[in-house]
Amino acid sequence: METVYVLINVEPGALESVTKKIPEMKNVKDVAVVTGAYDILVKIEGEYITEVLTTVVRGIRQIEGVTSTETLVEVKL
């Protein structure tokens, strides 16, 4: 199982609409509105890393109102 965490920034006024669209996407396990440098934190899990990253590139980044993302890949030790 591959896990990534996506840190997302959105345009002013877009937080609610973006937050509602993300849980509908494949492999999304959790969505949280956060404080600090980013607006939203998303946990995505999938069988393969390509599958998980596709959710980011073809899903989250395409949502109107998303201005930037940073993806953190969980490392299994």
Predicted segments, located by residue:
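A compositional/biophysical signature of low hydrophobicity enriched in polar/charged and small residues
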Residues: 1-77
